[in-house]
């Protein structure tokens, strides 16, 4: 199971986060002169074992102002707290919500979280 895609799909299923949408990368038309509300998800680490995946994820919220980026980050963290509604997700820890301006000056916040996901291990995966 791809944890990044799982979180992107989970966030995009919530109409309360719109007009922001989540993806694995920034939209091609995004720029510092035309900031739009957007959410990016990337795996930054974590552990894997035969039966459990514990991905560490950085979820970044981009918006026209620092306040809007912060507000979106809070909304995202609330949504992610309920990802355990998906059967394979056993637990989620929200580790931080941080002001994280982009190098080009765009307002951005980062939600760092760690999921605990049940995996389906088979002997054929050992090879």
Spell out what each predicted region is.
Residues 51-64:
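Short glycine-rich, basic-tinged beta-strand/loop micro-motifs
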Residues 36-38, 56-58, 108-112:
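Broad gene-expression machinery/nucleic-acid interaction feature
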């Amino acid at each position: 199971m791809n944890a990044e895609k799982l979180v992107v799909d989970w966030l995009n299923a919530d109409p309360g986060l719109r007009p922001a949408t989540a993806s694995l990368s920034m939209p091609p038309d995004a720029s510092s002169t035309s900031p739009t509300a957007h959410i990016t998800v990337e795996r930054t680490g974590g552990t894997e074992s035969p039966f459990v995946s514990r991905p560490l994820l950085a979820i970044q919220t981009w918006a026209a102002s620092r306040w809007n980026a912060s507000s979106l980050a809070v909304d995202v963290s609330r949504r992610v707290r309920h990802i355990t509604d998906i059967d394979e997700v056993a637990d989620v820890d929200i580790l931080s919500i941080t002001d994280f301006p982009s190098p080009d000056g765009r307002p951005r916040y980062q939600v760092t979280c760690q999921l605990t996901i049940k995996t389906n291990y088979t002997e054929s995966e050992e090879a």
